[in-house]
Amino acid sequence: MSTLQITGGQVLTPELTVRTADVLADSETGEILAVGDTAAGDRTLDAEGCLVVPGLVNTHCHAAMTLLRGYADDKPLDRWLQEDIWPVEAELTPEDIRAGTRLGLVELLKNGVTAVGDMYFEVPEVAAAVEEAGIRARLGHGIVTVGKDEADARADFEEGLAVARELDGAADGRVRTALMPHSLTTADPDLIAEFVPRARDAGVPIHYHANETTDEVDPIVDERGVRPLEFADELGLLDEGDFIAHGVHVDETEIELLAERGVGVAHCPASNMKLASGIAPVQEFLDAGVTVGIGTDGPASNNDLDVVDEMRDAAMVGKLGADDAAAVAAPDIVNAATAGGAETLGFDAGRVEAGALADLAIVDLDAPHLTPSHDLVSHLAYAVRGSDVRHTVVGGEVIVEDREVRTLDAGAVKREAERHAAELVSRAEGD
């Protein structure tokens, strides 16, 4: 057994209280062994002046879209996708996707993210980047059948199911998978209905965009005579362990369906604001017992992957949407970014206690914007920045130490991504 002892810090407990304690983790099993007065570890990690919190979880992301950061802005979702994003994505190579994913993972890890839900293409390349970086992930192939004939549409679903089967459990269990049809309006419903039972047989959950904009909701209501999540239920898409992204335009019946079925929501406030998609009813989700996680969405619609910043956005816009300053309170948001996100992605993490996965972020409290320290839970929700994360630990392994990623050469990753981004845009624009 090889152990890591995190010493000298304060610890955020599962009850969201703070106490001074050491944390001992088993780097071989990847679990926390003890919190408190622990035995000495084989190696130590200094947390003096820091708060040890559960690793943050980004429940919905398209990490490789770092290559398109700043490429197309200030448009509503449908125009943004059809005029800008989909045409350039048609030119993506597997090498582009790996380079963009590696850049995204460096950004995530430096901001204290230990697990990510990622929907994109060329999933073996994404999984390889995940294995190299040392992060944890729930991955899937984004299935889009718009504009494809029946054979190509079916092939896209077959690819989505195949990679879910083949890659589940990769990277020593850090990679888990899901079947990921893009949405109810971009993936053929008949094929969804056909492939859902096959995904269930394979033991993988299902993740998709749902109720993101009124342009998505209204056609389903008009054509099907039911709300989108009622239609999703008819297709078999609402089962325990499944999770949706966005859930902006939902009614009470749909919220009740999510709660009854045990389906989580990846709440992406910054992307929803930037694309003017709307404000998700987060307090209503919480009141109904729906598990809520925090997501950044892709870095082309955010435009960063900072879950710390996303917590603040979620709290602020949640209060605005509810017209209630007490709504979406700091403890709710901290829980969503940690335990709620871990539950949404299906990882036994999100809490600093014995038996949980040793996925941790160590936040440096020595900053003017974190002084004084009346309430550290409040600080996590409203004042902490991603750059305040000093160390990131995944499965008892130190991945970021003193703000430097140990598993990837960040400088080389940035240079490689810059080159791939330039070449991608040049191909797409015919230069």
Swiss-Prot record:
Binding of Zn(2+), residues: 60, 62, 209, 297
Swiss-Prot/TrEMBL catalytic activity: S-adenosyl-L-homocysteine + H2O + H(+) = S-inosyl-L-homocysteine + NH4(+); S-methyl-5'-thioadenosine + H2O + H(+) = S-methyl-5'-thioinosine + NH4(+)
Keyword Kinase recorded: no
Keywords: Hydrolase, Metal-binding, Zinc
MF-aspect GO terms: 5'-methylthioadenosine deaminase activity; metal ion binding; S-adenosylhomocysteine deaminase activity
Domain of life according to the entry: Archaea
UniProt remark on cofactor binding: Binds 1 zinc ion per subunit.
UniProt xrefs under Gene3D superfamilies: Metal-dependent hydrolases, Urease, subunit C, domain 1
Annotated binding of substrate, by residue: 89, 182, 212, 297
Pfam families: Amidohydro_1
EC numbers for this chain: 3.5.4.28, 3.5.4.31
Cofactor list: Zn(2+)
Alphabetized InterPro entries for the sequence: Amidohydro-rel, Deaminase_MtaD/DadD, Metal-dep_hydrolase_composite, Metal_Hydrolase, MTA/SAH_deaminase
Free-text function comment from the UniProt entry: Catalyzes the deamination of 5-methylthioadenosine and S-adenosyl-L-homocysteine into 5-methylthioinosine and S-inosyl-L-homocysteine, respectively. Is also able to deaminate adenosine.
Stated family: Belongs to the metallo-dependent hydrolases superfamily. MTA/SAH deaminase family.
Protein name: 5-methylthioadenosine/S-adenosylhomocysteine deaminase
